[in-house]
């Protein structure tokens, strides 16, 4: 059969002699080999044609004598052991990526400088008969090229040893014993050099390479990138292989039979090179003639479809006893049984007829030769498992709508790269792990790295975050007068999604990432050569944009108005908390990319359409080391979530924190916390000591017992803020940006709310203590004396706020008791009874909260906590009524000019302090909100916050301090399903089962789209049922707590009745007073209201509250005034 194929191929080749253009096209395919005379004539013809261009000079690799000898033997068909190398082995790179690739001729003795750009032609003795020689672009030396892999410890070859990256040197000799150069990037060998060559091409001959040419649309993609118009290749083979602007990279797929790297997208080229007999056998059409392959070729969408991953003939399995050499590029099986992708939640669904080939009759007659997966041969890249997998045809068809020529799509759009990371984050460069941005011919500089951390959030929450990011990228792409942003802005932004634990990730989140092209399953492994995989990394540049998010749907779209997004999806094997995710981001990928700004977001946080850009603008000030925007509460469609009082109260709390706290702290230059849900840091500011202190919380658990530090690192973002500002010999400051905002989901149920605040309160308290104890480090920083004084004042201000918070439990009770007793003394009636009833309710709720906090989980006692919050809300209503009632009565007495005058009322300590307290809180809220120009929360959320404020003080604080020993984040590890292991052979290769056909890859893509289709928001909204053991444990704990509460209360009643305590004595005394008596009569009856010490304490606390309110009001006013003048000045 093989001889028959060869004869047919020779006959077909002889018939095509008179078609030089066709012959040239297939000169490097590995299937046709012209005679020496033909190749010499063709070479001379193209040399003359390009001579007029004047800009192309031959590039030669510098080799030592023994290397040249080995190369000569290789190109002449000898492997150095007197073994003849066949054509397929010699043309390993044929048909790979852009297949017009030229084998470089060896250097001569006269080429002793690789950077020499002379334009002389090569001597004839160095032009081999079997390899045509073409002029290549000249070489220019760039002296200030940034490092590709920073702080890498691996030894790099010098320019003399390895003048430029030679892909042929690696792929042509991967079966030889000598060492092959690294393929880390196009200029890998120059990572530590001051100069390295790059390909240069004159402006008038700049070709389009593999950059997609976009249609005319508002984003200005039709500018040809940097204003250069696309030109033809002028038959330059180097231009056909590598994009001259550097926007393509070398893929790493799998090995073929002869050890060559296989290009999955080379189906049409390989089919065109077959003889009619081979095509007829390959296509397996029994019902009609092939017609010289014309119908078959027309049925293939060039550039859209990829051939199957590793096309093997059935005979190969019986002929060989191992799978190492089971590949042939002479026979390609084309399958088209994919299920059309359609989705009600996606606009990227393909039609029934929109399959890999357009001829339905042809595809119906093709028989499947094998199943969807087969074992293929791979080779570790620098000891790491790296695999570029083709994406589904649905995505390719959608991407094709964004460009006039689908063949111009670079590899970053056609492939998804997978890496199995087997090291710690700070060892990525050392262990030869890299990212695609560093592998382009011209490595991309990253200005902005967006880090999205997620745990088990669903596709709706993840989609909200990604939609906000995509909207911001669109905004920056539209910028016309920016020196940083513009049509190429997307190339400077990398979106890094880090999921905490493979066993915890939500299946629909994986489905969403798969629909974007950034996730495929089937080849991930959890062990490589007995090294555990710590993270699975998926890289892809998607053109699919999220256009709309509803409660149940994520709408996707791909057209000429969408922008590419560079996605880096990192799936951690184990659940190791959020701080570990940030460690991967900062110490791992940020060290590789070296971004200027790193923005942190939580999955579920949706930034505004230009919020990321506005946040980035804050860093125009070179002293700004970190910044944050406004965190808003997601209020739902038409603000429906405001009907939930818990959500409304949090909305008011977030608003007032931004209006009063963030603005004031921004004026000082130190913000106590840049929320991890939406904040940004200058990478230069956090490197070194700040990050070391930030990540200490991850490793200290293995060093012993650290109660204080463990609680402190529950709010690790506060530690990072403090370390940035106090960094030795540096003058970094933190700023708040009012123009930037992001909405986030907040707890809607009481148990989740309590658990969240437990971590916040404990972490913030211990972090504040840490900053107070080390505030002296401000004076060792690089700030000027004025800034140091301001920061010192701010630390004293923060200390007083912490002091007030510490005594908030007793302070609130004192205010409550004074109000209820005062109105009972003054006006008797039912107030006497209510003062005792509410006192007992207050005590019972407080005692019960203590008992339940010590032994029960909020989820198992949700009803009790809800009841407690309701009781405290009723008591707050009564307190407000008492305040208003006493104020009204007092003014009535003043108007009547009766026994109590206005001066006497003001001099009454209790009444005066209450007025000051109310004025420094509620009146302050209203005035500052008006100044901030956002007063609407006062109308929609103020009442809910006031009613729940007693629960903030009592329930949340009590539960937090009763569980100060609980250092968890509400997460725990779980075992994920095993993925399998990889163990390489002596030659560094291994065998693995993968999806082999484009239809199977399409089916995998459709599977995840179906997961999105089957989403039922009602079923997701229902809380998950606890297990039987959890129910049993919770039941026993509840019974125990109720018994303790009942026992304590009943015993206290006996003591209170016998000793007349607990308000009973006060009630009896007030009852004996006539209703006509005034407050002065009540004082003569010697009913103690407050002791002198209690009065002093009460006055101090209230005046501190008033002073804190005044400082925040002044800070808010100054911030808005400065912001106004900045807008006027820079407009």
From Swiss-Prot:
One of its GO terms (biological process) is septum digestion after cytokinesis. Residues 1-20 have a biased composition (Basic and acidic residues). It is found in: Cell membrane. Residues 1-22, 282-305 are annotated as: Disordered. InterPro entries: Chitin_synth, Chitin_synth_fun, Chitin_synth_N, Nucleotide-diphossugar_trans. The modification Phosphothreonine is found at residue 328. Requires proteolytic activation. The keyword Membrane applies. Its EC number is 2.4.1.16. Disruption phenotype: Cell lysis during cytokinesis. It catalyses: [(1->4)-N-acetyl-beta-D-glucosaminyl](n) + UDP-N-acetyl-alpha-D-glucosamine = [(1->4)-N-acetyl-beta-D-glucosaminyl](n+1) + UDP + H(+). Polymerizes chitin, a structural polymer of the cell wall and septum, by transferring the sugar moiety of UDP-GlcNAc to the non-reducing end of the growing chitin polymer. Required for mitotic division septum formation during adverse conditions. This is Chitin synthase 1. The gene is CHS1.
